[in-house]
Amino acid sequence: MKRIVLLMAVFAAVAVQLRAQTIATFNFHRLGSIEIELFDDKPITVSNFLKYAASGRFENQIIHRWVPGFVIQGGGYRVNTSDPQQYEIERVQIFGTITNETRVGTFRSNTFGTIAMARVGNETNSASSQWFINLDDDNGRPVAEGGSNLDNASGGYTVFGRVISNANVLNLFVPPPPVNGIHIREDIIPLSPMAVLTTNELSWNDLVYVDLSFRREMNLQATRNIRGIRQIAWSSVAGVTNSVDYSANLTNWVNFTNVVGTGAQMQFTDSSTDAQRFYRVKLLY
């Protein structure tokens, strides 16, 4: 089981309303990074995306499809570097397909800077590992209105996050090549049209790799009453074991409890009267 420590903090008071959110950093090789907020009200889709990342199946993934001004797409192919003498491009091994959540929770349109799940043809519930980022505000609109109808075609393409910083990096993919030093290769089947960073002989360093990292803003907070009893509260992550630890020195951590998150605020009482304690919440995937 992979353990991911997503936040560690102590605050002075407990808020009434706490909201968790996962922030994903997408680092595009040689181009820059963007941050995307993942939407908790698309729980199946977000959990699926995080599962691929935590399992290592997204390691060395590449942008295998680029349509300028429309989408960039990843999650389908990666570079296997297990043999240093012979790298090879291989398909990302999938866990299976997931339920379409286009209209679960808040409906969000496929507009510039949103991330959505790719699917197989017209099969509504066929998304697995592949994702795409929209490069046009009109992608979700009907074709008759000048859009690509991604919001409605065969149940729609589930939007599960949006860019919150460094959108200028996405703008590099909007104009057609050779602007911004990104080029298209259409002779590497089935990775066509594929984004590359050279017009010369292609090397492994010229692919557009995407490295992912995550942080969870869980609003972990603590307060102490007049008897010295501490109350710890945080925005839990639904369907995942939330592990609460404490430490007196930020070095040696002791587990308090493990609970399955509900997606709502959770609380835990620490009856210790130690002068100082730090707390953290880990997610056990």
Which residues does each predicted region cover?
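Cross-family detector of peptidyl-prolyl cis-trans isomerase
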Residues: 18-221, 227, 275, 285
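Residues that line or immediately flank small-molecule/substrate-binding pockets and catalytic motifs
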Residues: 8, 65, 260
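Sec-dependent N-terminal signal peptides
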Residues: 4-14
